A protein has these predicted regions:
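Short, solvent-exposed alpha-helical surface patches in well-structured domains
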Residues: 88-91, 186, 199
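GST-like fold's C-terminal all-alpha helical module
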Residues: 96-193
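Short coil/turn segments at secondary-structure boundaries
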Residues: 105-106, 201-204
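A generic structural-conservation signal
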Residues: 29, 149, 200-201
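Acidic/histidine-enriched, glycine/proline-rich intrinsically disordered or flexible terminal extensions
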Residues: 204-219
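A late-sequence structural motif
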Residues: 194-195, 200
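GST-like domain detector, emphasizing the conserved glutathione-binding G-site
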Residues: 1-131, 143-146, 217-218
Length: 219
């Protein structure tokens, strides 16, 4: 059985998790945090989450894992058959991750962990993120899914990344930068009504609450 390593608060972990759930693939979850420990680096050379264990062998990087899952478990496809449409799904994922989530991540310290982002950082992020939101709005079809009529890996990515972009910008800037893309809110509501997304989100919330309680207990 496949084993997914990571923790339920991680959006990249949850991207893979919800894909596995949507495809009906049996898997185990192995709790672990990011680490530079030598033993852990044998599983994930950059020390990140998630990783996937396959019969004692390991893969890292969420998109690589998704590609492997699709190649080995094609029964419930999360990529279209047409080559161009498959590329469009990957295009959306790239915009979501490189031009939105990783840009907004520079705000997470202030938004979620009690840190402070410099005025220069906030200014740069706001400018770069506006471009990412514009690109996503242009490319996403919302008919009803991001890439068209069928659920795809683009939705697995959007469902875990967009809420973080939304919340972090609302906290730091006092406005949700995803408001510039009106279809996003009903789209996310639609995704979150799916059993796989609901299960992933329920377990994410439980893990978030547990981490907050543990932190409060420490002091």
């Amino acid at each position: 059985m496949l084993k997914l390593g990571g923790f339920a608060v991680s959006n990249y972990y949850n991207k893979v998790k919800v894909a596995l759930l949507e495809k009906g693939i049996r898997f185990e979850e192995a709790f672990c945090m990011t680490s530079q420990d030598e033993t852990y680096l044998k599983r994930s050379p950059m020390g990140k989450v998630p990783y996937l264990e396959i019969d004692g062998r390991f893969l890292c990087e969420s998109q690589v894992i998704c590609e492997y899952i699709e190649d080995t478990h094609p029964g419930i496809p999360l990529y279209p058959k047409d080559a161009l449409e498959r590329a469009r799904v990957r295009e959306l994922i790239t915009i979501l991750e490189l031009n939105m989530e990783l840009v907004a991540r520079r705000l997470y310290g202030q938004a979620f962990f009690g840190g402070t982002a410099s005025d220069e950082t906030k200014k740069q992020v706001e400018k770069e993120l506006a471009k990412g939101v514009r690109a996503f709005k242009q490319l996403a079809k919302f008919s009803p899914f991001a890439a068209g009529e069928a659920l795809s890996y683009a939705d697995c990515a959007a469902g875990v990344h967009l809420p973080l972009v939304s919340l972090s910008t609302k906290i730091v800037y006092g406005r949700d930068m995803l408001d510039d893309c009106a279809p996003v809110k009903p789209y996310l509501k639609m995704l979150n009504e799916r059993p796989a997304f609901r299960k992933m989100n329920d377990e994410r919330k439980a893990a978030t609450d547990a981490m907050a309680a543990a932190k409060a207990k420490k002091g």
